[in-house]
């Protein structure tokens, strides 16, 4: 999971030193961040999560060979999702236009320095990731210079560009260029409890503005507040199928849901996702469904969480929302769901 927006003036050297290498149940490379108290991937493993949560629901096969596929990845982290996407597009003959929103270059650098990570990918995939890490972009063909940036390397099919920095500040730049044109958004930030900056109703609304009519927003996250934020952005929301078998994720992925998919269009039931259940809809209407807010796109995590607690208390006092404990009791769920 890519590092999301952090507090101002954080020394990246210190953050890098904190990252530790982990291995998931599938044996794939991953990292752990003590700062956020979370792994970059679920306990299932990075490769399995990338395939089941992001690649499979994207249904790349619905795009024709030679067609351009525009993808935005929120928090790139180790580059595992991107690597799998690169190889999937190459296999299907798709021209990938990729945009990454990422604060910290360290996770990708650490991954590329590890044999365990490199052994997972084809040489062309590694060359593209290396070019992205070194130059912040890749470009098929001439390696032409773009927007005053340094020349992009001639690696991989299509093109890719990393927008470094706080995603809340770089997203407007992307909106200027790709509003209503994005086929897929892969949202892989740290969980809302630890990185609420990238799960606010305002941020989700801007991402929704990027989506093409048939575009899909996809994430591991099943949080009621996030789903409510997507609903407020006028997106149709469905639940991803629960991965089975395998241990549950440590990334806010309850046993009854494998994540969330959202779109401007109706999401017909499939083997990959289903309509939200009555239990999940009630979850959105209780205290847990109070969305995260950041109207200035500058608030830190503590302030966002504090303001949400105030909003939750107000909604409860006015009878606008039920308590989450009452919801859990009604559905026989354990604390923390």
What spans do the regions from the language model cover?
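Class I SAM-dependent methyltransferase Rossmann-like catalytic core
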Residues: 4, 10-69, 78-92, 109-112
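SAM/dcSAM-binding transferase cores
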Residues: 17-22, 260-337
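The AdoMet/dcAdoMet-binding core of the Class I SAM-like
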Residues: 60-143, 150-180, 186, 306, ...
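A short SAM/SAH-binding and catalytic strip from SAM-dependent methyltransferases
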Residues: 183-198
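Conserved beta-strand signature within the Rossmann-like core of class I S-adenosyl-L-methionine
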Residues: 184-186, 213-221
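A short glycine-rich, Lys/Arg-flanked "PGG" loop and its adjoining helix->strand segment in the class I
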Residues: 197-214
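Conserved Class I S-adenosyl-L-methionine
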Residues: 227-258
């Amino acid at each position: 999971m890519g590092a999301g927006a952090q507090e101002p003036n954080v020394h990246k050297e210190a953050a890098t030193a904190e990252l530790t290498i982990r291995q998931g149940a599938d044996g794939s490379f991953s990292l752990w961040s003590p700062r956020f108290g979370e792994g970059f991937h679920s306990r299932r493993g990075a490769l399995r999560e990338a395939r089941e949560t992001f690649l499979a629901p994207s249904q790349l096969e619905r795009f024709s060979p030679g067609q351009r596929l525009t993808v935005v990845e929120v928090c790139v982290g180790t580059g595992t999702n991107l690597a799998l996407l690169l190889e999937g597009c190459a296999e299907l003959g798709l021209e990938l236009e990729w945009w990454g929103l990422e604060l910290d270059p360290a996770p990708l650098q650490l991954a590329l320095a590890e044999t365990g990570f490199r052994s997972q990918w084809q040489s062309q995939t590694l060359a593209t990731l290396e070019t992205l890490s070194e130059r912040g972009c890749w470009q098929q063909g001439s390696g032409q210079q773009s927007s005053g940036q340094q020349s992009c390397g001639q690696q991989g099919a299509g093109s890719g560009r990393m927008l470094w920095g706080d995603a809340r500040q770089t997203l407007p730049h992307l909106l200027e260029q790709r509003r209503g044109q994005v086929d897929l958004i892969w949202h892989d930030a740290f969980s809302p409890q630890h990185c609420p900056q990238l799960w606010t109703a305002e941020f989700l609304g801007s991402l929704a503005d990027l989506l093409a009519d048939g575009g899909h927003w996809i994430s591991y996250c099943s949080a009621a507040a996030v789903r409510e934020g997507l609903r407020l952005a006028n997106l149709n929301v469905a639940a991803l199928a629960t991965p089975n078998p395998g241990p549950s994720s440590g990334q806010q992925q309850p046993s009854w849901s494998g994540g969330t998919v959202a779109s401007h269009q109706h999401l017909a039931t499939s083997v990959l996702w289903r309509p939200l259940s009555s239990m999940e809809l009630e979850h959105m209407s209780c205290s847990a469904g109070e969305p995260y807010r950041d109207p200035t796109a500058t608030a830190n995590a503590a302030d966002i969480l504090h303001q949400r607690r105030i909003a939750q208390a107000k909604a409860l006092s006015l009878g606008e929302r039920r308590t989450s404990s009452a919801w859990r009791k009604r559905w026989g769920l354990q604390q923390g769901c």
